């Protein structure tokens, strides 16, 4: 009987056992609406805030800067719609992003272009990383938002977000990174990178599907994408998915505690796979940067 090996963790990871246990426990025993003021609601609300603290520690930001969403796609759309609103209010402005972003950004860019918003795409080199000299040429005082992913989901290329953030702020632009693929593989720091916005999804680091995070630095522009109730201080309406959010918090704690060990294991497995493929298949090309690469990603062509 043949053995099936799962090699699609950049699409989604299996929930960690600790996360599965936590989600199941909350689903079976904590059913109150986290926005309600009664005992059942406060109990659910406490779990949401526990998760918020863990996520803030993982991303090195303030708890007040975190907005829970349905995932990175929603967070990315929210951030780009904020930029759209700013450009429309000013009557001018541009967005700068890269040509290799996740579809939730690329497709949003297509929409924005269709309604007249100016968006420039920075190219990447053979190593899959944004060409910094080309990005710098695109920067200027009219750039409202610069958005570059932390790590690419196909090549694994890691971008120099700290330097790009400096470049963006130098010309007065807001800075966003989609860190979805990087969480749990490299240290991600909103404070060290001086980010205005960050987005990520729980299911890419052993957390539940359908839950994500939007970090918005205190004082930066924010316009809700989902309107309705006053959840998340009016930033994102909708009844809290308490179990998924709590599970996200558990996954965040696991990512913090196991970062070094996880990376060693992933890199060893990646190298074993790479060596096996190169040995078995002639003329294989390993794509992307091998120096600046997410440990769990291998991209080859033959």
Predicted regions span which residues?
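Pyridoxal 5′-phosphate
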Residues: 1-302
